[in-house]
């Protein structure tokens, strides 16, 4: 069964995990629409690599773009709350890399903003790269295997 991604995603950040998101979207028949990065040249290189049509010269432009549906935040942890505030207040859905915030107060604020603006907020927490998952994936149980993702 194939999937198709109809949403316009923007990546805030161009690091290793942002590359994984770009590849995952492509595998599902979608792609990133735009990218914002602290270093404009890195944003341009990332856009060229993945055929992204828009690169913002200033990070704040991503929050103002009416074409963007979902913002993926993969910046350093200590910047997450400032970008969450802007994205959620702008009415954008957000997928934010772990850890989503530095403390429970920031998380409560982000959840409240998402609720007030009727948008979705999710933390990109995956176990697939953790050493324990790699070890578990080697275990076979009867006919099933932990290698299969459910």
Model-derived segments and their meaning:
Residues 28, 50, 65-66, 130:
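Acidic-histidine catalytic/liganding microenvironments
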Residues 30, 69, 92, 119-120:
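Short, well-ordered coil/turn segments that N-cap beta-strands
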Residues 101-149:
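A contiguous active-site-proximal alpha/beta segment in oxidoreductase catalytic domains
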Residues 21, 54-113:
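Beta-loop-alpha module in the N-terminal Rossmann-like domain of NAD(P)-dependent dehydrogenases
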Residues 32, 52, 68-71, 145:
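Local beta-strand N-terminus motif with an aromatic residue
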Residues 12, 97, 124:
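Short hydrophobic "strand-cap" motifs at the C-terminus of beta-strands
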Residues 1-50:
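N-terminal Rossmann-like dinucleotide-binding module
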């Amino acid at each position: 069964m194939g999937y198709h991604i109809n949403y316009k995603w923007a990546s805030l950040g161009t690091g290793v995990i942002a590359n994984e998101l770009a590849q995952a979207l492509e595998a599902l028949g979608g792609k990133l629409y735009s990218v914002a990065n602290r270093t404009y040249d890195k944003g341009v290189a990332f856009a060229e690599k993945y055929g992204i049509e828009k690169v913002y010269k200033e990070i704040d432009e991503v929050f103002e773009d009416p074409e963007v549906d979902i913002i993926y935040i993969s910046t350093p942890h200590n910047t997450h709350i400032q970008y969450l505030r802007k994205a959620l207040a702008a009415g954008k859905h957000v997928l934010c890399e772990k850890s989503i915030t530095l403390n429970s107060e920031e998380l409560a604020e982000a959840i409240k903003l998402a609720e007030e603006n009727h948008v979705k907020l999710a933390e990109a927490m995956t176990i697939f790269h953790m050493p324990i998952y790699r070890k578990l994936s080697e275990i076979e149980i009867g006919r099933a295997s932990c290698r299969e993702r459910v």
